Amino acid sequence: MAKTTPSSPSAAAAAELVVKSVNTIRFLAIDAVENVKSGHPGMPMGCAPMGHVLFDEFMKFNPKNPYWFNRDRFVLSAGHGAMLLYGLLHLAGYDSVKVEDLKGLRQWGSKTPAHPENFETPGVEVTTGPLGQGVGSAVGLALAEKHLGARYNKPDFEMVDHYTYMILGDGCQMEGISNEASSLAAHWGLGKLIALYDDNHITIDGDTDLAFTEDVGKRFEALGWHVLTVANGNDGYDEIREAIKVAKSVTDKPTLIKVATTIGFGSPNKANTYGVHGNALGPKEAEATRQNLGWPYETFHVPDDVKKHWSRHISEGAELESAWNAKFAEYEKKYPKEAAELKSIITGELPLGWEKALPTYTPESPGNPTRTLSHQNLNAVAAVLPGLIGGSADLTASNMAFLKSSGDFQKETPTGRNLKFGAREHGMGAICNGVALHSPGLVPFSATYFVFTDYMRAAIRIAALSKARVVYIMTHDSIGLGEDGPTHQPVEHLASFRAMPNILVLRPADGNETAGAYKVAVENAGRPSILSLSRQKLPQLPGTSVEGVGRGGYVISDNSKDGEKPEVILMGTGSELEIAARAGEELRKEGKKVRVVSLVSWELFGEQSKEYKEMVLPSEVTARVSVEAGSTFGWERFVGLKGRAVGIDRFGASASAERLYKEFGITVEAVVAAAKELC
C-alpha cells in the first residue's frame, strides 16, 4: 500500500478500502458459520483488523506456491478461529480455499476443517486447535529460520530470511505449553518471531476475571520478550501497523504485541460475550450485524474493489519467488556445497545411499544398551543428513541424544545442532513439530525418558496428525531402568502409542534393529517415530537385521524342518527379545520345534501383505507366547485367544532391574512354562 497523507483523497479512499476489506473477512466468517450452523465466529470478527494488516501489508508469500521456501510463516495458535485464516487465504488468491470451500466449513471432505490442518489446506503451516500447541510450533518455525540462516546465509547472499508471525488468545496464554515455548524463544533470541495476542478478555466460561488475572505483558517481559501494546485492535489500523513495524526492528528478542480486541466485534447483542465464541450468531443477529456494520452484500460476497486490491498478491508473490530463485542460482554458483545442503533441506531429498552410513553389528559385537546404540546411529545419520537437529529435555547424558560433531544451538551460536530444551517436554514436542514442518529436509529429534511422554503426549499426537517426521528418542523404556521405581517405569506407554494413528513405535532389541529403526524413522517422511530404548545392556542377537525391522516383524530363528510348521511361536520386542530367544533354545533342548519372532514394530508389520504375515505367524500355529516388559494390552492380536502374553499389568517398583524382572515373572523360565502349557 502506498504511503499517503491522511488528509489526501487517496488516503481516505485507502482507509475506506481497509475497512471494507476487514469487514469482508468478518462476514466471510459469519456467513461460513451460519451456513453450517457450527463454528467460532467471534475470534475472526475481533481479529480481522490485525489479520488484514498482517497479511495484506507485511507478510511475503506466493499464493500460487504455498510452499515457497522463503515465505513468511503464519500460525493461528487459537485454531478455533480458523475462518480468519481461511478468509485471508481466500482473499489472497490461494487455490486451496475457494468460496465452495468456505461454504463447506467443518464438513466431510472439505479443505476447511474445524481447526487448521497443514495436510488438508495448502497455506496452513501447522496444525493447531489444542490451545498453546501453535505457540510451540511457531517457536519451532522461528528456530528453524534462525538456525538455517546462520548456517547458510553469506555476507553477499541472505537466502534464509523470513519472519514467523502468530496470533494467540487468552486460552493459549493459560496453557503451560505456551510458557515453556515462550521461555525458550526468548532464551534463544528468536528476533524474527512476532506474536499478536488477541487480548479480548473472554473465555468459554465467561470473562477472564474468573480465572486469569495475571499481567501477561509483565510475564513476557520477565521471560525476555519485547512487549508492545495496541490499545485499539478493533479499528486502530495505524496502531497495529506501527506495532508490527517496531516489532520487526527488534532483532535480538521475540516480540509480543498485546492487541486489545472485542470478540464478535460488530454484533449488536453478542459482541464482548462468551456466547459469540463457539456458536453461530443466528439469522437475526447476523442480519443485525450487517445493518450495524453497513454491509449490504449477499452472503460470501467479496466486493470487486476488495478483490482487485488483494489480487496483487498473486503477481507480487510470483515476483518475490522468482527473484529468490534467481538469487539462489547465483548462490549455487558461488557456494556449491552450502547450496547443495540447503537444497536437500528445502526438498527433503535424501542423499543417495545415505543408509550405508549406519553402523553394522554382528553377534560378536559388544553388548550395549539400545540407548547407547541409538547414540551411535544418531551420530552416523547426522554425518550424512544436514537437516538432523534436536536434543533432550534436560536428560542429554541419560538419553545419549546429542551430536558429537556439533555445538549447542544458543542465542549467540545458532549454527549448533544440539538443542537444550531444559525440563520442558511439552514445549519440546511442539517446537519439534514446527521444525519438522518448516522444511521437508529438517529432521528433528527429541529425547526424554519414555514415561515422560505423558508430559508431551498432546504434541506427539499433533505430530502424528500433522504427518510431521519427528524422531522421539525415548530411553529407560521399562522396569529395566531399575531403582528409580514406578514413577519412572513405563508400563502402559507402548500400548497407548500403538493405539495412536499414524505413528511408528519401534522397540529395537540390539544394534542391527536399532540401525533398522533409524532407517525407518528417516525414510518415513509422513509420520513420526518413537524409538523405545533400554537403559540396561543387551546382547547382539543372531538373526536380527535392518531389513527385518523394515517389515516390522520377522523370524530370527526357527529349528523346524523345511515344510514343517513350528510347534510354538515365541514373540518379543526390545529388551525381551533376548528372553524369547533364550527360552526358544531351552525348548529346543527338549526337542520342541520353536520359532522366535521379533515384533519390533506392530505398525509396520500390520502394513505387510497378508501372505507375509501368514508366513511369519502361520494361523494354524495357535501355541503362541509373547514377552514384553509392559502392559499385555493388545498382544491378543498376535497370540490369539489360546496364546499367552507374559508382561506387566500393574505399576512397577523400586529395586534392581534383575530383581524386578524376577518378581514380575519376565523371565526365560516363565516363557518356557507358558509355552509348555500350550504344546
UniProtKB/Swiss-Prot annotation:
Residues the record lists as binding substrate: 40, 277, 371, 398, 476, 484, 535
SUPFAM superfamilies: Thiamin diphosphate-binding fold (THDP-binding) (SSF52518), TK C-terminal domain-like (SSF52922)
GO BP annotation list: pentose-phosphate shunt
Keywords: Calcium, Magnesium, Metal-binding, Thiamine pyrophosphate, Transferase
Cystine connections: none
Signals that turn on the gene: By rehydration.
Binding-site residues, thiamine diphosphate: 80, 129-131, 171, 200, 277, 425, 452
Cofactor(s) demanded: Mg(2+); Ca(2+); Mn(2+); Co(2+)
Cofactor note (record): Binds 1 Mg(2+) ion per subunit. Can also utilize other divalent metal cations, such as Ca(2+), Mn(2+) and Co(2+).
Residue sites binding Mg(2+) per the record: 170, 200, 202
Gene Ontology cellular component annotations, sorted alphabetically: cytosol
Residues at the catalytic site: 425
Expression across tissues: Leaves.
Catalytic activity: D-sedoheptulose 7-phosphate + D-glyceraldehyde 3-phosphate = aldehydo-D-ribose 5-phosphate + D-xylulose 5-phosphate
GO molecular function per UniProt: metal ion binding; transketolase activity
Catalytic activity, EC: 2.2.1.1
Residues with site note (Important for catalytic activity): 40, 277
Function: Could be involved in the conversion of sugars, which are a major phenomenon in the rehydration process. Catalyzes the transfer of a two-carbon ketol group from a ketose donor to an aldose acceptor, via a covalent intermediate with the cofactor thiamine pyrophosphate.
Similarity annotation: Belongs to the transketolase family.
Quaternary structure annotation from Swiss-Prot or TrEMBL: Homodimer.
Protein name per UniProt: Transketolase 10
Organism of origin: Craterostigma plantagineum
